[in-house]
Amino acid sequence: MPTVFPDDSVGLVSPQTLHFNEPLELTSGKSLAEYDLVIETYGELNATQSNAVLICHALSGHHHAAGYHSVDERKPGWWDSCIGPGKPIDTRKFFVVALNNLGGCNGSSGPASINPATGKVYGADFPMVTVEDWVHSQARLADRLGIRQWAAVVGGSLGGMQALQWTISYPERVRHCLCIASAPKLSAQNIAFNEVARQAILSDPEFLGGYFQEQGVIPKRGLKLARMVGHITYLSDDAMGAKFGRVLKTEKLNYDLHSVEFQVESYLRYQGEEFSTRFDANTYLLMTKALDYFDPAAAHGDDLVRTLEGVEADFCLMSFTTDWRFSPARSREIVDALIAAKKNVSYLEIDAPQGHDAFLMPIPRYLQAFSGYMNRISV
């Protein structure tokens, strides 16, 4: 834990909760009569409101993207390597907004929050929200903050999908889009992985149809398995081999069906256990479904070029060589469509062994390229 924060840290930060009374119509046909969004901001909004950057989070992300909530906090925000003075998203230049999306479980309205109409936890009654719904709620957030146009909307993985959707839904409100380790839609394999994770949760006896909180229980077993499956897909084979290989946790093989004998087994169990103590099962179901549903070209005859013809932003896409969850080929689909639509786009495929999670890591070539693009943005 830090006693003195590094010079390139945003330091101590405090989340804010913003309440919205105007009903939000959702893609599903349902609506939220009112809702909360929890945000953090870093840096200062300039006089012309031209330096604002929106950070969109991935599946298990949230509003705490940088800095520390207290001097006792063990780790900084989830993207601290990229946000702060002198970092790619330089808070001396930019006013940065990070939020917890609707349906999340870190303070924004979601399945784990109280339904104001009933006074009870939403649970399974919280309506399905999509990437488009998130973007519409984020646009209202921008209005509340007095931001007419984002200098950039930035995100990795599911966050990159939101950044892309911003340029489609609100083309005049985004000058730059940074879409990292993402895709224009999920492959069948990705949907399959999500379904296995969901079934792990749904088959947990303590899930109770999504109303487990009313009974004071948590479907930890299902959440743990879901996270273990997901975590495997976030790492590359090379990264897992280098980190664990076939190293034993025990001195020798026990030839026992129930023993945790390999280091990689122990690691996955730890990751699953830790995740199950901090994440909501209904939120996990919702987030994976939002991933599955994302397909902006579907409304344009499955033609991604047509879908992107109306965008006005400049684009930067980055992918990682060993990412097999969202492979470089998926980013190139977006790049090729943007080129065909005669849009400005930069693309970099970064050689990195870490797999999909590379977008979260302080890889020098990645940070250098990220900084290079952000430095070009005028405010």
Curated annotation (Swiss-Prot):
AB hydrolase-1 domain boundaries: 51-360
Listed GO CC annotations: cytoplasm
Effect of loss of the gene: Methionine auxotroph. Defect is complemented by expression of the E.coli metA gene.
Keywords, in A-Z order: Acyltransferase, Amino-acid biosynthesis, Cytoplasm, Methionine biosynthesis, Transferase
Annotated site residue numbers, Important for acyl-CoA specificity: 325
Entry EC no(s): 2.3.1.46
Pathway in which the depicted protein is active: Amino-acid biosynthesis; L-methionine biosynthesis via de novo pathway; O-succinyl-L-homoserine from L-homoserine: step 1/1
Subcellular location: Cytoplasm
GO biological process, one term: methionine biosynthetic process
Catalytic reaction list: L-homoserine + succinyl-CoA = O-succinyl-L-homoserine + CoA
Annotated NCBIfam families: homoserO_Ac_trn, PRK00175.1
Family note: Belongs to the AB hydrolase superfamily. MetX family.
Protein name: Homoserine O-succinyltransferase
Classification of source organism: Bacteria, Pseudomonadati, Pseudomonadota, Gammaproteobacteria, Pseudomonadales
